[in-house]
Amino acid sequence: MASPAPLVASISHQMVALQTLQLLQQEWGWGDGPVAPGNPRDPDHVSTAPARRSGPPRARPGPGREERGGGVGTRSRRTAARANSPEEEVVRGAEGGAELLPFPRDRGPCTLAQMAMRSALARVVDSTSELVSVEQTLLGPLQQERSFPIHLKDSVEFRNICSHLALQIEGQQFDRDLNAAHQCLKTIVKKLIQSLANFPSDAHMVACASLRQILQNLPDI
């Protein structure tokens, strides 16, 4: 039985990249945060809810310190004020990923360039999610039966590109990083198709068809 270790490691790097991009979408108000692989979100959906923040639990009032005048509402308003403060606008990325920079939200309607950037980012996120799903459900069992080449360095590069992308704010460098992530993801998919091409079994053909569908969703930008 062939070892699935290279594929597992490759998926791990892709998952970190995916979570980093999903958190980037969430921080910019372009998505709902991390979702399970294989469940792409609507790229046109824009979340207006603030990102959830974690913090230490508040102590309950002790005897003689009972809050008055609608204490729950008061606490909620104070919590909302903290969540919307500028100091809370930096969000940690996925474990091992990058720290996301704050994105200025109150900028009015999106320009055409911003809409195109949002669409391109959503396409990379959804395609990465689909790729991880195909690798886990189809390629994993095939790799255990018969080994085929896995190019781990491409997934490592993809993760690094996405981590660098998360450090950028709009501009030419962001566009270059997004295009690099797009092209690197296409390279990963193409090499997987090539690795499976020499195995004519039905299961390999199904996996190749799924990978080709991902390629169709990644046109050149």
From Swiss-Prot:
Signal peptide: none annotated. Disulfide bonds: none annotated. Residues 31-92 are annotated as: Disordered. Ubiquitous. InterPro entries: DLEU7. It holds the Pfam family DLEU7. It comes from the Eukaryota. This is Leukemia-associated protein 7.
